[in-house]
Amino acid sequence: MSEPLPSSFDGHEQFQEETPLQKFGRRFKEEPWVPAVGLLGCAATCYALWRAYRSMKAGDSVEMNRMFRARIYAQGLTLLTVVAGGLYYRTERTQRREFEQALELRKGQEKRDAWLRELEIRDKEDKEWRERHAAIEAAAKQAGNKPVLAEQDAARSALEPSEQKYYGVLDAVRDLVSRRE
């Protein structure tokens, strides 16, 4: 299957994926320590760099070297947190991935089933329309086998009111007499 099957259910809320912000919120709730400590490590790194910059401007090389070492420690803490969190939550991530794949498979199957139901309904409507159309054609053919009088009445009614000649009581009596003969 190269592309998904088209359906009118494409815009349905049930088949929508989560937004990146929702995904971030869900991941933050699942693994709260990794981003929190990682953010703390980033803040400590920025603070150490800022202090090193101020020490360099002031000409205090001892404080500057100390802050550069603190920056390295903060970056190490950040990296260690990310790696440890990745190892700790690896099994949960694989389980979550398997669950998402099963969910995606189920959604795809539901979408396909809904599409097939929709096609069946359209096919049924099409068959009903064809049957109705065939019945109308059959009725029209039967109506075509009637005597010429029906054609005359149809031609008479097709005339505009301004084009019709005056048809009075005497003319109606003459028509009745001529039809009987």
UniProtKB/Swiss-Prot annotation:
Location(s) in or outside the cell: Mitochondrion membrane
Protein keywords: Membrane, Mitochondrion, Transmembrane, Transmembrane helix
Gene3D superfamilies referenced in this protein's UniProt entry, alphabetically: 6.10.140.1320
Entry's transmembrane regions: 33-50, 70-89
Quaternary structure and interacting proteins, as annotated: Associates with the respiratory chain complex III/complex IV supercomplex.
Family: Belongs to the RCF1 family.
Name of the protein in question: Respiratory supercomplex factor 1, mitochondrial
